[in-house]
């Protein structure tokens, strides 16, 4: 299995695995995910708990012994269910928020840090490749911030909420409004075989 970790952030959070179908773009990974329903209700197996014991004394001084655990939970209400994204749950991603101005400021710093990191790698001394990566990321950011596009996105950090790390984007495509799609800057991910 391949695990993709945050390359730039201090905590190197897990952000993605190859358990998900990854569509490789020029500078991004795009991942279709799904919403799943989680049950908040607790199932109690009174056989494993052994039941509870309670005593009552009636007017005739008769003692009644009760060992039915269900009596103890008679007035407890069901907690219900909730929806969560399967990728968010599996990798403990944390939703955060940006307005256009703060996201643009974040991306300027992130791109700078990412390009500096890439330049420091001995295998990445090709200036044309570095320029291609930088322009590709800038083009992606420009497109996602254009007009009303920005409002379509939700933002997620790794579990440590590292402010220097990669922020994943989630949106719903116009042609597939029921499938949440995540977008990651692929050069900001470190692939690890586990």
UniProtKB/Swiss-Prot annotation:
SUPFAM superfamilies: Mss4-like (SSF51316). It holds the Pfam family TCTP. Keywords: Calcium, Cytoplasm. InterPro entries: Mss4-like_sf, Mss4/transl-control_tumour, TCTP, Translational_control_tumour_p. Residues 1-194 form the TCTP domain. The keyword Cytoplasm applies. PROSITE patterns: TCTP_3. PANTHER family: TRANSLATIONALLY CONTROLLED TUMOR PROTEIN-RELATED, TRANSLATIONALLY-CONTROLLED TUMOR PROTEIN. Belongs to the TCTP family. This is Translationally-controlled tumor protein homolog 2.
């Amino acid at each position: 299995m391949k695990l993709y970790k945050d390359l730039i952030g201090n905590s190197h959070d897990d952000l993605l695995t190859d358990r998900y179908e990854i569509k490789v773009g020029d500078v991004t990974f795009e991942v279709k995910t799904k919403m799943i329903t989680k049950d908040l209700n607790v199932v109690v197996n009174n056989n494993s708990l052994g039941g509870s014991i309670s005593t009552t004394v009636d007017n005739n001084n008769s003692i009644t012994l009760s060992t039915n655990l269900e009596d103890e939970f008679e007035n407890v209400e069901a907690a219900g269910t909730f929806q969560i994204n399967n990728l968010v749950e599996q990798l403990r991603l944390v939703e955060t928020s940006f307005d256009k101005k703060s996201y643009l400021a974040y991306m300027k710093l992130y791109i700078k840090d990412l390009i500096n990191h890439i330049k420091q790698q001995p295998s990445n001394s090709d200036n044309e490749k570095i320029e291609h990566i930088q322009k590709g990321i800038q083009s992606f950011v420009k497109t996602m911030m254009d007009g009303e596009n920005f409002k379509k996105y939700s933002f997620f950090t790794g579990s440590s909420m590292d402010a220097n790390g990669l922020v994943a984007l989630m949106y719903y495509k116009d042609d597939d409004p029921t499938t949440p799609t995540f977008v990651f800057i692929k050069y900001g991910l470190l692939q690890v075989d586990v």
